[in-house]
Amino acid sequence: KYIEENIKKGFNVYQSKPNTSEKFVSPTIIEINKLSNLSEEQFGPILHVIKFKSSEVSTLISDINNSGYGLTMGIHTRIESRADLFSQQCNIGNIYINRDMVGAVVGSQPFGGRGLSGSGCKAGGPNYLMQFLDEKVVSKNSVAFGGNAELLNIQEEK
């Protein structure tokens, strides 16, 4: 249904083969002209492509961050500084630069979205277990003015 709607809207849609089953979605590329054409996240083999001019980069980054979503984004460019700009300024959980957009390695690469796409790292990565911790700071002045150092160092008998 989603793919058919985009065809009706006049977007270029490319599929590996026609979809003949309601239970299967063929890998699909949908070329859209602006980010606001996306109204919800799509899960499945659907890739949205946006072509943009250099003069539109800051607007596109702003649109990405204001969309509310941020699971995965792919950037394909020969301009290293542009890839760096997108990766630094876009609030996205997983950013793939000049490569395929699959293959987060559970256990070593954090994987999770931002905003409406999730709440950060869900699997893998060195900080994964940190989400299960409840930090507490206790600060005690053990040498308060007038304190007796000998009394402060008495050990309890076992």
Task: Please tell me what each predicted stretch does.
Residues 3, 8, 19-158:
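Conserved C-terminal structural/oligomerization subdomain of aldehyde/semialdehyde dehydrogenase
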